[in-house]
A protein has these predicted regions:
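Bulky hydrophobic segments
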Residues: 1-134, 150-185
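Non-cytosolic membrane-interface motifs at loop->transmembrane helix junctions
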Residues: 133-143
Length: 185
């Protein structure tokens, strides 16, 4: 008899979605790689912000004056920037606890979100240093990204609670042989 392995398609689907998600994060945050001359110190100074909320408040302060006074355009830019940075790591906060037991604790998920976000910002800084790109390294992005991972984690917990309330089976663990139904922690 042939040795047949059972494939759990839900686990494989979640893992596949996670890989696709990581590829999309890399594509959105690091590509295209610009080819150009290294940035001058002056340009680099303008593309780094280590003061929390400084760029967000600066953008808010420019509503009505930047872009020829186009208020809606400026508000749209702020919403896209802040909202996009929050949305970026929501899937990480949702999927990490499903794939790895370590991230079932919120502090570990927050640390993962922080580590991923700081890594992205450092890679963008290196990109700016060596290619002359217009990428900005901003602590506000890190704050919004970490907030996104927290939101994703709470969506994960709410999903488990709703599934338990309605007696539904959910994929809660992809690193074991069997699907574990409902995490009651």
């Amino acid at each position: 008899m042939k040795n047949k392995k059972h494939v759990n398609w839900w686990k494989e689907l979640i893992r596949f979605l996670f890989v696709v998600y990581i590829c999309m994060v890399v594509a959105v945050t690091l590509f295209p790689l610009p080819i150009g001359f290294p940035s001058s110190a002056e340009n680099l100074n303008r593309s780094v912000n280590f003061i929390p909320f400084a760029s967000i408040f600066k953008d808010i302060g420019q509503i009505g004056s930047a872009y020829d006074g186009d208020v809606l355009f400026m508000i749209g830019l702020i919403v896209r920037n802040v909202g996009g940075n929050v949305l970026l790591l929501i899937p990480l906060g949702f999927l990490a606890p499903i794939i790895w037991d370590t991230y079932k604790k919120i502090k570990n998920t927050i640390l993962l979100g922080f580590t991923i976000s700081v890594s992205i910002e450092l890679l963008q800084l290196i990109e700016s240093l060596f290619s002359g790109s217009a990428r900005i390294t901003d602590i506000d992005d890190v704050i919004c990204n970490v907030l996104g991972s927290i939101v994703g984690y709470f969506i994960y917990k709410i999903t488990l609670k709703l599934a338990a309330t309605f007696n539904m089976q959910v994929v809660d663990k992809t690193n074991s042989k069997d699907i574990k139904c409902i995490d009651k922690s």
